[in-house]
Amino acid sequence: MTRPPPPLILPPPFRALAVVGEVWPAALDAARAGSEPGTVLWNDDLRRCQAAVILRPDCPLATCAASALRLTALAVADALSAVGPPNVPVAIAPPDRIEIDEGLVGGVRIAAPPGTEADAVPAWLLVGIDLAWLAADPEAPGRDPWRTALREEGFGDVAAADLIESFCRYLRHRINEWEEAGDAPVEAAWRQHTTSGAAGGRLSAARRARGADAAPPVDPAACLAGPSWAGLLE
């Protein structure tokens, strides 16, 4: 008999809704059905850590999509650093990938109502995270130096509930900071997190050769079309 997932302890305005199976399709259905902003859909899966948050923006899609994607990625990086092993090298590979020790561990994604114009305020905005607990090939972990998994990087004692709770706390902090202080602190944190993984990583020389310090801008249209990491966690 499958045990129900533990209840999440989330800061307001978030409230949890556990789902079975893939979170993103369920979250899209919930957003389209008019679920309240702040609803956090998540699963307690053994292979992937997935969550999605329904937001209600008050600015045009072109602005809020790029900001939401960056705030979500920053919150994931913050959460992984908080609940993981000390000094774990977490970094963001723009626009939407999350790396540990320069290996892809997952990413973030966004969605809005189809057909929303760039200068229109969307009825809802959905942000999601998808992280690999286990390697794509559990029989040969570490075979692919460009991909990794949380269990391989020392997160074996971390529960999905703990990681998602931490992510939600940091997401609220990042959103509040952005609403109060604008883009400046987001830009500073983005530069820090998109380069911090370069020092001491297993592929740091190659990363520096590619020019890691020059983080490209986030293209909201491209990100709304789908995540760049789609299919790479399988």
Language-model features: where?
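Short polybasic amphipathic segments
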Residues: 98, 203-216
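Short, acidic (Asp/Glu-rich) active-site segment that either coordinates a divalent metal cofactor
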Residues: 117-153
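N-terminal lobe of the biotin/lipoate ligase/transferase fold
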Residues: 1-86, 104-105, 111-113, 210, ...
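Short amphipathic alpha-helical signal-transduction/dimerization elements
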Residues: 77-81, 151, 168-175
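Short histidine-centered catalytic/ligand-binding loop motif
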Residues: 53-67, 145-160
